[in-house]
Swiss-Prot record:
This is Pyridoxal 5'-phosphate synthase subunit PdxT. The keyword Iron-sulfur does not apply. The gene is pdxT. The keyword Hydrolase applies. The active site is at C79, H170, E172. It comes from Bacillus mycoides (strain KBAB4). Keywords: Glutamine amidotransferase, Hydrolase, Lyase, Pyridoxal phosphate.
Length: 196
């Protein structure tokens, strides 16, 4: 069984743990840097990206997270997690982890009162997935090797680049675990390749 960590500094941690377990993997809440060595994949949950960055800096997680990304182990960023994974952020000079060759705009759909749900078609996952958008970012631009998995209107809301997956929405806030299951499969495949 693969072991998937959920970065436990802030955000919808408990919901991600439940979704990972429902998808047949072991879930671990990561609160210490050394735990990164024990896991096969990592979820960066939604939350408030500036608060999350402050906590990442406070607990000296940034370099270990970048090292984890370079190791080739899969990472999945949802909402604020997408912002953490992006190489370029509109209106900000420096990236956070910067593992995905994507450009992201923060709070692109508006503030909290503009939160909404939308039925999405997601490549590799299926139709009618309810995306919960809360002060959501979206992807403005992608490199050639980034696969766009889902659009909402004209906006890219789910993308994949090799071992990295990012979504504007919160897949963990519904009882539909298909997006998490897709990530669990990514982690299983990556682990199999390491064994071979």
């Amino acid at each position: 069984m693969v072991k998937i960590g959920v970065l436990g500094l802030q955000g919808a941690v408990r919901e991600h743990v439940k979704s990972v377990e429902a998808s047949g993997a072991e879930a671990v809440v990561v609160k210490r840097i050394e735990q990164l060595e024990e896991i096969d994949g990592l979820i960066l949950p939604g939350g408030e990206s500036t608060t999350m960055r402050r906590l990442i800096d406070k607990y000296a997680f940034m370099e270990p997270l970048r090292t984890f990304a370079k190791s080739g182990k899969p990472m999945f960023g949802t909402c604020a997690g997408m912002i953490l994974l992006a190489k370029t952020l509109i209106g900000y000079e420096e990236a956070h982890i910067g593992a995905m060759d994507i450009t992201v705009e923060r709070n692109a759909f508006g503030r909290q009162k503009d939160s909404f749900e939308a039925a999405l078609s997601i490549k590799g996952v299926g139709e009618d997935f309810v995306g919960v958008f809360i002060r959501a970012p979206y992807v403005v631009n992608v490199a050639d090797d980034v696969e766009v998995l889902s659009m909402h209107g004209e906006r890219m809301v789910a993308v994949r680049q090799g071992p990295f997956l990012a979504a504007s929405f919160h897949p963990e806030l519904t009882d539909d675990h298909r997006v998490t299951a897709y990530f669990v499969e990514m982690v299983k495949e990556a682990k199999m390749k390491k064994v071979v």
